[in-house]
């Protein structure tokens, strides 16, 4: 089993292998390129499609951005991200349509064992010793707003139309149509028509 296949199978994997470093190097290099180009340059956004798993036709990243793999992330139509997006997409990350990210959002679909010698000196079946990681997918539904300084951990699903309040750390699933916030993030209440701001037009 290749190292990337171990990630998707939920097994411990060695992120230092050349197989994985080559995938990450491509994403890191293209992110650096994106981050140095003027935001009015028409070629800037096309760089995203050179490393992302898939993305809709309409999207905008304010930047700077940092994807770990890029190819493990799949984004729908009409996506927007504000400043400083970090995507640790060791496991696959799925983002729906019409999703908005505030500044400093981090998606962390990777983890390390709690036991120290497993974390820093794991002996693998082939005999080599290295650090170890494991990863869990993140699923974000349609029409979700993730506000500033939010961290979303692996294994989490956020339902359609949910709003994640600023500064939250999302460790468990959030249901559709809910306002959720806190550390750890918890569903606070359902979003209703009483939340409408149309009167401000």
Segments from the language model and where they lie:
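Terminal amphipathic alpha-helical/low-complexity segments used for targeting or macromolecular assembly
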Residues: 1-57, 114, 185-201
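Short secondary-structure boundary/capping segments
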Residues: 4-5, 51, 130, 136-137, ...
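Residue-level recognition of short, solvent-exposed, well-ordered loop/turn junctions
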Residues: 8, 139-141, 175
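Extracellular beta-strand-rich, repetitive "passenger/adhesive" scaffolds
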Residues: 59-61
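Flexible, glycine/small-residue-enriched loop-and-beta-strand segment within the central core
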Residues: 65-75, 80-156, 183-184, 190-201
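C-terminal/domain-terminus segments
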Residues: 151-185
